[in-house]
Amino acid sequence: MKIKTILTPVTCALLISFSAHAANADNYKNVINRTGAPQYMKDYDYDDHQRFNPFFDLGAWHGHLLPDGPNTMGGFPGVALLTEEYINFMASNFDRLTVWQDGKKVDFTLEAYSIPGALVQKLTAKDVQVEMTLRFATPRTSLLETKITSNKPLDLVWDGELLEKLEAKEGKPLSDKTIAGEYPDYQRKISATRDGLKVTFGKVRATWDLLTSGESEYQVHKSLPVQTEINGNRFTSKAHINGSTTLYTTYSHLLTAQEVSKEQMQIRDILARPAFYLTASQQRWEEYLKKGLTNPDATPEQTRVAVKAIETLNGNWRSPGGAVKFNTVTPSVTGRWFSGNQTWPWDTWKQAFAMAHFNPDIAKENIRAVFSWQIQPGDSVRPQDVGFVPDLIAWNHSPERGGDGGNWNERNTKPSLAAWSVMEVYNVTQDKAWLAEMYPKLVAYHDWWLRNRDHNGNGVPEYGATRDKAHNTESGEMLFTVKKGNKEETQSGLNNYARVVEKGQYDSLEIPAQVAASWESGRDDAAVFGFIDKEQLDKYVANGGKRSDWTVKFAENRSQDGTLLGYSLLQESVDQASYMYSDNHYLAEMATILGKPEEAKRYRQLAQQLADYINTCMFDPTTQFYYDVRIEDKPLANGCAGKPIVERGKGPEGWSPLFNGAATQANADAVVKVMLDPKEFNTFVPLGTAALTNPAFGADIYWRGRVWVDQFWFGLKGMERYGYRDDALKLADTFFRHAKGLTADGPIQENYNPLTGAQQGAPNFSWSAAHLYMLYNDFFRKQ
């Protein structure tokens, strides 16, 4: 039965009024604190991330801050430069304006604030007013409008100085090193140009800190003539005006000679018609807010969180650069290891799902970026991995692909939620061509999982690791390191590994393939993959457990001709099985839309087989929860690969069958009961990454305690799917009230302490922002 929704004139008027209010960026001042004046190139917080929150937009490779007081007013401090794969500050303040009247410096009062899409300063004195608005005009250039109101002539002075000091944590120097001393080839140089100045940078290839081409420049262009004096790493520019004037300045960070050449025409056009570019930016942001803020039931505080999420995701958008030929979205522009254009699939699926609702073009581009490096037949590096999607792509290729990058990673992929994300983009845009474009890529990805990660061939893929120099010898023997006391020895081969495990003469084992398998899950040190601290393991053994309960086993996956394809953990993961269920479900839906009924039928059959297996084999009736299962030498009588790994405790993988819709109602009822139990997951901030009863639980442990917003949202969607929406709404309200910093002006961070609500991890974090936006859409309501 179809239900018609009839909107009365009053309802329509309220919705139109809400939409108009929501789209007004001026209603959302200072949602994120963008003030600051960096004193160091690496001005880190307690966790080694840059501690300020510069404004980035339009995929730009540089960002600006607001002044933090009188000393920095008139400029937009920073500048934050993205040096291919890292964020580094260039200056404490660069191009700071001071105004002089009759030979005296004008004493202004300052009002500075951010709105979505702009930074604004208002400088006020008795006879002079200055209003400065900074927006982004292109993916490489920001535009500053400076409106000066005065009845008298004025002298304008701009100044700036490049940073000298290298590094600090929470404002305290980590050393007395200078930038020039640490990077002698950086060779920063300020030069005057016809209408401004530029900073040129020498070539530095410091793999883990600073990457420049030797061709990069930071350019400043002004719409009025200036006289510039340069003294080493300092400059002063001067101009005279006879009264009220509006002037324009462009700032461009250009990373290659080709970019330097290409952007000059853009800069000339921007200065020729600045109002066009400013209006385009304003209208673009009004459109983001109009599309994105569609929940009239949310409180004003919850709506501000949604705006913070939109600002965060758009700020982490990067335009094409280096090996990444598409726009993309990174985990965190200020994150130590998450900046530049570093792109992960797992983050992408979630980012794109959210951004489809307010920035669908970039949602598509982000997914395209990931699949642009999907392994094709005849690949020169890993021909055995056709369909594989690398874990991390970035500006620079790995040495194996002819680059000098250290971040590019093909050791693993990420869980198969790609089709879920692609389908959400379609649901929002109704773009059938989008499905036609992505469908064959998704099929190849799906087939790779079954070919390269299904050791026992039962259609239930495992997490694992690729064939890679980090995992195996040249001859294909798996590497591992045995540690005992202060001695360690690297060995190779599965037979040797089995003997070492059986003898037990070790304190710990380090297995690169195990690390990669946990990365492949998206949950880096989760208990289910055998990760547990020594103290926790000692306690577990003292309470009657066995150390071997936490020892993982591996299998080689080989093609029919014996070629080593990679490795699988000898356990089938319930979350990956559930994601694969969804993958089949969405592929069937796409195949139907694209007129491929036979393919749709096959994927529906595969989905049903997975659902049957998940409920038969992965649910433990004693503890009433879903778990991974061990792969034994022979299948059990019921067709299962083995028994659930109950001893490693409960984690969010247990509600993955609910989120993906694979659970039976009876099993879902049981799981929800566990989720709502205060002795398990219903903590101060609920639904952490390990239950309180898990032997490996730690409130501050990355994936064995902390609350990640994606797993939280997965849990709520699973509850809703099986009839527990009211309970989900209560948990959402608890999260909103207890997760610290959400409604303040701090950045969105990676995760939260389940017992205290304290924020943890990288700031300005995309997938947290994505899922906070989804929470706003789905669950945030006035209570």
Language-model regions, residue ranges each:
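Aromatic/His-enriched, Gly/Pro-containing loop or helix-boundary segments
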Residues: 129-135, 385-434, 762
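Bacterial N-terminal signal peptides that target proteins for export
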Residues: 1-10
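Long, repeat-rich segments with strong aromatic
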Residues: 569-596, 700-726
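Structural helix-adjacent loops and short alpha-helical linkers that scaffold large soluble proteins
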Residues: 294-303, 355-368, 425-440, 591-609, ...
